[in-house]
């Protein structure tokens, strides 16, 4: 829950004084900065004309024969890190499929690559869903099954090993050792490295590639690594910069559209108790998908996040127990005729919520998919029920058992709801995908767990200082008679287990296409970035998210 300060408010013209836990949220950092933007058609046309031949040259590079395995893997890795792989998904999948099938167990003399290539191959294949064998590590182990100390001097190999260790699944102890081994030796080596490798290693230790938000990692790699390297492919670099700027224009246009929608709703004035974070909501949606084909999905998701943030703050930072009970019931009924039973301030968000979903149904009807909006509505109804339980615990000072807390708090992460909503605007999302998601598959549970425990760790001190009893850490400490440090260690362990669930859930054969699984992975990545160093980057964006937003939707590459 948000940090709150109790103050008196008179609402609905009722004479009696109502004590409300009103949150003291900071105003938006952005004002009307993103309210107006229109794409320069001449610039767009110029970029598109230059990109086309660069794209064909890149495709020719991918399809060229006679390359060494290491050269092929490095080319794919660079293309992915530069953010242009979405142009070549079919080609990359075919290449990796061939590499995997040629020697899936990595046994015998056919396999004799260096540390860097081995780890890169392992990571790329795992990230594309191939359950590559751990035998690929065998030649780098000593007689005790530990990584050879002689590897400690190979910085590029260590960096590749470090990145590969983050795609580990349950029971892969060798990768646990690899993470510790590579981290220790990279930290020791960093002060002695030359730029840009030094910056690349420093960044990786701060934010692993696998757990990073793709668009942020792309911007960093182009500007701080590849552009600074002595040896680079100028075609790929030029292509990447043009493509980044081209996409950024689309992103700015979307953000302007959403900002105008938000300003027209006027929640800043009519519901001043709530957070004004529409730009941060767009950052969140951009983290889930940045590619151009997901423009509709992005706009729908950012509106959903912004709206649920208002609902969250209504439960978290303003409503009374009685009001929230009515609000919860009315949302279950989902009928505009019920609006008169609500206090005046709740009518505003309730009507906006119903209007938003009416717009979704109209938009989805063009593709004959309006019926799948039902799944998002059901998740929303589930969410507000849990919000209501959480609010009642807080207001009444109740501390539930840890198991009961977690069961409810998994829902209030909003991630069951947001994962479902993220599929709405995806053109190929059919009822099958929504049905699968509605059953809370293990990969989704892993994502939700990560969000819950990392949030609880990050906000523990703030919530403790305001006397909140029903926090996950406090509940766990009481139930298991452990210290704060031990409880946090357990929650951290749960988060790591959640990542392993996600990594396993991405492996083939998958129940639904990778396109949909990637949304769940990206939601988990958003948590890793937004709560970095135990900061609540959404509520207090100036410390964590602001630099990323500027990099993603303000700063462009010089062409």
Swiss-Prot record:
Give the EC number: 4.2.3.61
* Tissue spec: Expressed only in treated leaves an not detected in control leaves.
Swiss-Prot/TrEMBL induction comment: Up-regulated by UV treatment.
Quickly give the catalysed reaction. Answer: (2E,6E)-farnesyl diphosphate = (+)-5-epi-aristolochene + diphosphate
Chain location of the short sequence motif DDXXD motif per the record: 312-316
MF terms from GO for this chain are: 5-epi-aristolochene synthase activity; magnesium ion binding; terpene synthase activity
Listed Pfam families: Terpene_synth, Terpene_synth_C
Q: Which residues bind Mg(2+) 1?
A: 312, 316
Instruction: Please state the pathway this protein functions in, per its UniProt record.
Output: Secondary metabolite biosynthesis; terpenoid biosynthesis
GO cellular component, as recorded = cytoplasm
Details of cofactor binding: Binds 3 Mg(2+) ions per subunit.
Residues that bind Mg(2+) 3:
455, 459, 463
Q: Broadest EC class?
A: lyase
Which amino acids does the record list as binding Mg(2+) 2? 312, 316
Task: Specify whether Metal-binding is a keyword of the entry.
Answer: yes
The UniProt entry, under InterPro entries, shows: Isoprenoid_synthase_dom_sf, Terpene_cyclase_plant_C1, Terpene_synth_N, Terpene_synth_N_sf, Terpene_synthase-like, Terpene_synthase_metal-bd, Terpenoid_cyclase/PrenylTrfase
Keywords per UniProt:
Cytoplasm, Lyase, Magnesium, Metal-binding, Plant defense
Can you say where in the cell this protein is located? Cytoplasm
Entry domain remark? The Asp-Asp-Xaa-Xaa-Asp/Glu (DDXXD/E) motif is important for the catalytic activity, presumably through binding to Mg(2+).
Assembly information from the UniProt record: Monomer.
Q: Any idea what job this protein has?
A: Catalyzes the cyclization of trans,trans-farnesyl diphosphate (FPP) to the bicyclic intermediate 5-epi-aristolochene, initial step in the conversion of FPP to the sesquiterpenoid antifungal phytoalexin capsidiol. Produces germacrene A as an enzyme-bound intermediate that is not released by the enzyme, but is further cyclized to produce the bicyclic 5-epi-aristolochene.
Q: Which family does it belong to?
A: Belongs to the terpene synthase family.
According to UniProt, the name of this protein is 5-epiaristolochene synthase
Lineage of producing organism: Eukaryota, Viridiplantae, Streptophyta, Embryophyta, Tracheophyta
Name of the gene encoding the protein in the UniProt record: EAS
């Amino acid at each position: 829950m948000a940090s709150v300060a109790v103050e008196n408010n008179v609402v609905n013209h009722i004479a009696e004084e109502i004590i409300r836990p009103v949150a003291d949220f900071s105003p938006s950092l952005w004002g009307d900065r993103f309210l107006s933007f229109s794409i320069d058609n001449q610039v767009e046309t110029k970029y598109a004309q230059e990109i086309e031949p660069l794209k064909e040259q890149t495709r020719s590079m991918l399809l060229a024969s006679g390359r060494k395995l290491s050269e092929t893997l490095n080319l794919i890795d660079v293309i992915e890190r530069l953010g242009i792989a979405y142009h070549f998904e079919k080609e990359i999948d075919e290449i990796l499929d061939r590499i995997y099938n040629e020697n899936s167990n990595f046994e015998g003399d056919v396999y004799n690559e260096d540390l860097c290539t081995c780890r890169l191959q392992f990571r790329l294949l795992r990230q594309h869903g191939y359950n590559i064998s751990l035998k690929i590590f065998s030649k780098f182990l000593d007689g005790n099954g530990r990584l050879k100390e002689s590897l400690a001097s190979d910085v590029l190999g260590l960096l590749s090993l470090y990145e590969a260790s983050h795609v580990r699944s349950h029971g892969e102890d060798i990768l646990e050792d690899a993470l510790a081994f590579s981290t220790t030796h990279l930290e020791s080596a960093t002060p002695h490295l030359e730029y840009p490798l030094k910056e690349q290693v420093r960044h990786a230790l701060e934010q692993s590639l696998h757990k990073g938000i793709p668009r942020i990692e792309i911007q960093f790699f182009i500007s701080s690594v590849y552009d600074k390297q002595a040896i680079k492919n100028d075609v790929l670099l030029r292509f990447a910069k043009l493509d980044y700027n081209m996409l950024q224009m689309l992103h700015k246009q979307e953000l302007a559209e959403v900002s105008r929608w938000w300003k027209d709703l006027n929640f800043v004035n009519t519901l001043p108790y709530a957070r004004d974070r529409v730009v941060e909501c767009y950052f969140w949606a951009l983290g889930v998908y940045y590619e151009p084909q997901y423009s509709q999905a992005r706009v729908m998701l950012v509106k959903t996040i912004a709206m649920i943030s208002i609902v969250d703050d209504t439960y978290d930072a303003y409503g009374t127990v009685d009001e929230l009970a009515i609000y919860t019931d009315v949302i279950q009924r989902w009928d505009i005729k019920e609006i008169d039973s609500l206090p005046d301030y709740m009518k505003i968000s309730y009507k906006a919520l119903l209007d938003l979903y009416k717009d979704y149904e109209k938009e989805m009807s063009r593709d004959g998919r309006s019926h799948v909006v039902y799944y998002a509505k059901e998740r929303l109804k589930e969410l507000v029920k849990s919000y209501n339980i959480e609010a009642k615990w807080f207001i009444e000072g109740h501390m539930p058992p840890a198991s009961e807390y977690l069961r409810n708090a998994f829902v209030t992460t909003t991630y069951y709801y947001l994962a479902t909503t993220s599929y709405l605007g995806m053109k190929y999302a059919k009822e099958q995908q929504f049905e699968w998601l509605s059953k809370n598959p293990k990969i989704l549970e892993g994502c939700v767990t990560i969000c819950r425990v990392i949030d609880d760790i990050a906000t523990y001190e703030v919530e403790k200082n305001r006397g909140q009893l029903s926090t996950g850490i406090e509940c766990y400490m009481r139930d298991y008679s452990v210290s704060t440090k031990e409880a946090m260690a357990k929650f951290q362990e749960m988060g790591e287990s959640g990542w392993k669930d996600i990594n396993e859930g991405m492996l083939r054969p998958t129940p639904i296409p990778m396109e949909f699984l990637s949304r769940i992975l990206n939601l988990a990545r958003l948590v890793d970035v937004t709560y970095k160093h135990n900061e609540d980057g959404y509520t207090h964006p100036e410390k964590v998210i602001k630099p990323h937003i500027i990099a993603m939707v303000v700063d462009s590459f010089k062409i």
